[in-house]
Amino acid sequence: MPLPEPSEQEGESVKASQEPSPKPGTEVIPAAPRKPRKFSKLVLLTASKDSTKVAGAKRKGVHCVMSLGVPGPATLAKALLQTHPEAQRAIEAAPQEPEQKRSRQDPGTDRTEDSGLAAGPPEAAGENFAPCSVAPGKSL
């Protein structure tokens, strides 16, 4: 009976002395769950036209109230007028400009509306207006 070659015996002895290795990917240690971060100041995004909801957000210390939809000037005015009287003039003046441009382009509009708009320039036409001008340290 032929004897196996010494190299084969060494290979078998090494294989026999080794512990069976686990399959790759079976020794996965699960990571500890992380706690979500808490943010001290969040911006409230609302699409509501209800001024009571805006006032409620104001009481909670929200610095800026924004809308997700396409709000009219009156909706934005309700959110800002209670605290910023200077902003009120800018918001009230802003809707007049698009109406003037539209009335000049569309000759079929009512002339009584044009005469009321063309009486004078808007009060805050030259002012720059930022809808969220509250400093971070102050609440509405």
From Swiss-Prot:
Record region (Disordered): 1-39, 84-140
Low complexity bias spans: 118-127
Top-level lineage group: Eukaryota
Basic and acidic residues composition-biased segments: 98-114
UniProt keyword list: Phosphoprotein
Pfam family, one: FLYWCH_N
Residue list for modification Phosphoserine: S21
GO molecular function: RNA binding
Protein name: FLYWCH family member 2
Naturally occurring in which organism (per UniProt): Homo sapiens
Phylogenetic classification of the source organism: Eukaryota, Metazoa, Chordata, Craniata, Vertebrata
